[in-house]
């Protein structure tokens, strides 16, 4: 992992430096922008080549809602490193919880899923975030997330 992180766009190589996830469980392709301590925006290009479309659902492919939540959580964990840059290379950011998850519209192959995660507060060792996913400027998923370091 890198020892230093700077705000801005992050490609998949930079994301893999921060997250422990690997294929086939990386649910974010790029970080588009970061305002440390406030908001991060990431994206996932949803393609028919995703393994989960083999069974979810044959003839009517839909991205599983739990994987949309996972994508939001991964983007949130990247943001967590910007709230605690001393943790980079020394700790793992973990998804600690989810509340008020809602799935508004199906996400299908060919969609570009934009994740927007905002820092709400930090309390003790927990980072609280508000997260939404968009396709074509329409909310498709939203939730309140929690993350922590170990």
From Swiss-Prot:
InterPro entries for this protein: FabA_FabZ, FabZ, HotDog_dom_sf
One GO term (biological process): fatty acid biosynthetic process
Catalytic activity, EC: 4.2.1.59
Annotated active site: 56
Subcellular location: Cytoplasm
Cited Gene3D superfamilies: Hotdog Thioesterase
Function (record text): Involved in unsaturated fatty acids biosynthesis. Catalyzes the dehydration of short chain beta-hydroxyacyl-ACPs and long chain saturated and unsaturated beta-hydroxyacyl-ACPs.
Protein name as annotated: 3-hydroxyacyl-[acyl-carrier-protein] dehydratase FabZ
């Amino acid at each position: 992992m890198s020892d230093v992180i700077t705000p801005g766009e992050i490609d998949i190589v930079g994301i893999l430096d921060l997250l422990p996830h690997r294929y086939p469980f990386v649910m974010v392709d790029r970080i588009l922008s970061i305002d440390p301590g406030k908001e991060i925006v990431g994206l996932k290009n949803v393609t028919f080549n995703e393994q989960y479309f083999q069974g979810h659902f044959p003839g009517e492919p839909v991205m599983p809602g739990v994987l949309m939540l996972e994508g939001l959580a991964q983007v949130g964990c990247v943001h967590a490193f910007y709230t605690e840059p001393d943790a980079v290379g020394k700790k793992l950011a973990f998804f600690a919880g989810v509340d008020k998850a809602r799935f508004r519209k199906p996400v299908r192959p060919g969609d570009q899923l934009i994740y927007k995660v905002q820092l709400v507060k930090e309390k003790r060792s927990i980072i609280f975030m508000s997260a939404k996913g968009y396709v074509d400027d329409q909310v498709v998923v939203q939730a309140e997330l929690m993350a922590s370091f170990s």
